[in-house]
């Protein structure tokens, strides 16, 4: 089964629920930022922010100005692109294996994209297995998920959240 983003919108927003609520009760200070900044207050904001990193100017701002990103060390091999795979305008993390077509997408670490798959305008979170002949477009696939072969998920008008808990594969 899958969950649509509208089901997840009932979360707290820092600006709406904290800053605006307490602006007359507390002393709140801020300053104008000229550089890149996004308030991630919804699933759509999360999606848009990740997609922004596919733009060269945003990517260069972060990775050239701040080249050292400290994170959990996994000691993973670089991504592997098997014969027949095609990747265009995408970010693919370490430990991934790509067998299909990935376009305008962000693929997090340790994800597997099967043969004859098409992934477009999507975010595939870490440790996801996507079976052969699968089409995913305008979606966010949840971490540690397994998408069965021959699946079809397309977000129409809004980002679709794909959550499938199937049998696990180890990469």
Q: Residues of each region from the PLM?
A:
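Short, small-residue-biased leader/transition segments that mark boundaries at the very start
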Residues: 1-5
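Left-handed beta-helix
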Residues: 8-171
């Amino acid at each position: 089964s899958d969950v649509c983003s509208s089901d997840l919108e009932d979360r707290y927003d820092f600006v709406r629920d904290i800053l605006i609520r307490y602006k007359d009760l507390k002393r709140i200070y801020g300053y104008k930022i000229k550089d890149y900044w996004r308030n991630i207050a919804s699933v759509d904001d999360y999606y848009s922010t990740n997609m922004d990193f596919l733009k060269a100017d945003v990517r260069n701002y972060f990775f050239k100005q701040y080249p050292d990103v400290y994170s959990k060390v996994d000691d993973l091999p670089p991504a592997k692109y098997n014969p027949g795979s095609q990747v265009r305008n995408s970010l693919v993390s370490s430990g991934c294996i790509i067998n299909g077509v990935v376009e305008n997408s962000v693929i997090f670490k340790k994800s597997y994209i099967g043969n004859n798959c098409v992934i477009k305008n999507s975010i595939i979170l870490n440790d996801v297995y996507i079976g052969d002949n699968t089409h995913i477009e305008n979606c966010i696939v949840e971490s540690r998920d397994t998408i069965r072969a021959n699946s079809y998920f397309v977000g129409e008008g809004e980002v679709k959240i794909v959550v499938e808990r199937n049998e696990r594969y180890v990469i």
